[in-house]
Amino acid sequence: MRVLGLMSGTSADGVDAVLAEFSGSPSEPKWSLLNLVCTPYPEDLRQTVINAGQGITLNSREWLELSESITEVHAQAALACDPSAQAELVGSHGQTVWHRPPQKNHRGASWQILQAPLLAELLKRPVVHDFRAADLALGGQGAPLVPMADAALLGRVGGWRGVLNLGGIANLTLIPPRSGPDRRASVMGWDCGPANSLIDLAVEQISKGKLAFDHDGSIAASGHPHTTTIERWLKEAFFQLPPPKSTGREQFGLADLEQRLKELPKLSTANRVATLTAFSAAVVAQDLNNLRIRNLVRPLELIVAGGGSRNPVLMNELRQRCRGMRVLNSDELGLSAEAREGLAFALLAWWHCLQHPGNAPAITGAKRAAVLGVRADPA
């Protein structure tokens, strides 16, 4: 089956559309990536999405128009990726505007904004959406949902394999080896903390809105990270939590950035960006090191995808902090760094049609595995 996968992450830079074909066993599918198109959000829409994700109040009309605009850009991305309508099905994550993990006093909740019936009608094809709801209803975090797809798409090697997505948030998948005593272990996955979210916000502030991100890590490359501050930040409560855990821009957004910058008052602009960049690598390295210390997992390699994989300073920080582990870009395995999440949600939509579970209780904390997503058909 040919499926379109649509993904817009916490960086809110636009929609990644992937056209893929799947066949064979759901858990070990044969797949091919047929096309990838990245459609940016208009700047005013991007800013509204970021503001909404940081708790800035919108009125009812603004929420309505935001959901409509997001849906229209998703449709544009889908049509650009699949102009001849080869796909029989669309899997769309929607745009996360708020994510609340389960806490002692209330269940978890997550809101991905999208008008799925409108998207189905615009594309004249069924759309599977709202992928997180079933896991949340079962007491799970609702995130991350990509690890089971990672395991199915990338397969196993002779040792533990890590897959790291550096979007707005850094999320990690660990895939068990194909042989040896750990071969029957469960896939693991969780959110480590901020990846690009704080860096992007800082660069936007510094440039007075002229830059949306640190292109090629050029600002960070001209500075030096403040190691003592990073070590102090790593002791914060979230970074001490064991998996399962999930997070988003509501935790690592503008308010968090401003607090961190107050702790760096005497540093130059370049040193501040370098510190935030090194911090993003450090939160991942600390989680991996904690697993190693507990003799749970020691990955042979770490495959990196997402926008942060294009930042050579961030990638170098990862290599420095994850010694003994091969750190490589997913491009080296034939999977474009920009395609990974769109491909994953295309697979989750295909699994929905096959009634194949898409979550993993060991990863999200849900009571049981469940088929993910809700289907909206054209009118």
From Swiss-Prot:
BP terms from Gene Ontology: 1,6-anhydro-N-acetyl-beta-muramic acid catabolic process; amino sugar metabolic process; peptidoglycan turnover
Swiss-Prot/TrEMBL catalytic activity: 1,6-anhydro-N-acetyl-beta-muramate + ATP + H2O = N-acetyl-D-muramate 6-phosphate + ADP + H(+)
Gene3D superfamilies associated with the record: 3.30.420.40
GO molecular function: ATP binding; kinase activity; phosphotransferase activity, alcohol group as acceptor
Pathway: Amino-sugar metabolism; 1,6-anhydro-N-acetylmuramate degradation; Cell wall biogenesis; peptidoglycan recycling
Protein residues bound to ATP: 9-16
Top EC class of this enzyme: transferase
CDD domains: ASKHA_NBD_ANMK
UniProt KW keywords: ATP-binding, Carbohydrate metabolism, Kinase, Nucleotide-binding, Transferase
InterPro entries on file: Anhydro_N_Ac-Mur_kinase, ATPase_NBD
Family matches, as SUPFAM superfamilies: Actin-like ATPase domain (SSF53067)
Record EC number: 2.7.1.170
Annotated PANTHER family: ANHYDRO-N-ACETYLMURAMIC ACID KINASE
Biological role: Catalyzes the specific phosphorylation of 1,6-anhydro-N-acetylmuramic acid (anhMurNAc) with the simultaneous cleavage of the 1,6-anhydro ring, generating MurNAc-6-P. Is required for the utilization of anhMurNAc either imported from the medium or derived from its own cell wall murein, and thus plays a role in cell wall recycling.
Family per similarity comment: Belongs to the anhydro-N-acetylmuramic acid kinase family.
Name of the protein this chain belongs to: Anhydro-N-acetylmuramic acid kinase
Native organism: Prochlorococcus marinus (strain MIT 9303)
